[in-house]
């Protein structure tokens, strides 16, 4: 448990993208009923130099009663730890946009901050089934996140495995379906089955 002397805020949601917005829309009315505070973390550019789409998103979040904070997840681990110290629960909807190593860095910072409850970015693939040495470094990192969480007892953690998001199959970073080259890569082996879902189903 975080022992900070100041009053802790309730819930910090990392990311307001495809999944983050679906989660925030579902979470806001429930949090309001329970008098819980919700903060959405977005990139600084979303606030400082918003696109038309960003402006609409920010307006929706504020209408939902959600506080919005600009913060770069590419920041160093210490900065992340200091941020997370202010919250009881961190819900990670950041995805892989910040690059390799980010999910491990976020997880280490959550643990260092003694956050009471953490929902890691583990939506979709069951990384225990895929295992390590899957051929996809992003998946290997996610497996390592699980091992790190299991190695400690201070922070409660919850994994929500629902099936991979359909759109991610076609993301270049995942290297599963490459439409330009007309290639398809198996996850670990051709015997690995894939279940897909959409974010609004997960958050509903």
Predicted regions and their residues:
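Short beta-strand elements of ligand-binding domains
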Residues: 116-122
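Residue-level "edge-of-site" marker
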Residues: 74, 97, 123, 162-163
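Oxidoreductase cofactor-interface core, primarily capturing Rossmann-like NAD(P)-dependent enzymes
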Residues: 2-37, 41-43, 47-53, 125-204
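Conserved internal alpha-helix in NAD(P)-dependent oxidoreductase domains
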Residues: 113-116, 140
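Hydrophobic/aromatic beta-strand patches that form the interior of the parallel beta-sheet core
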Residues: 39, 69, 91, 119, ...
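Structural motif
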Residues: 10, 88-89, 117
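NAD(P)H-binding glycine-rich loop region in Rossmannoid oxidoreductase-like domains
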Residues: 47-113, 128-131
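A cross-domain feature marking catalytic cores of carbohydrate-active enzymes
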Residues: 42, 94, 122
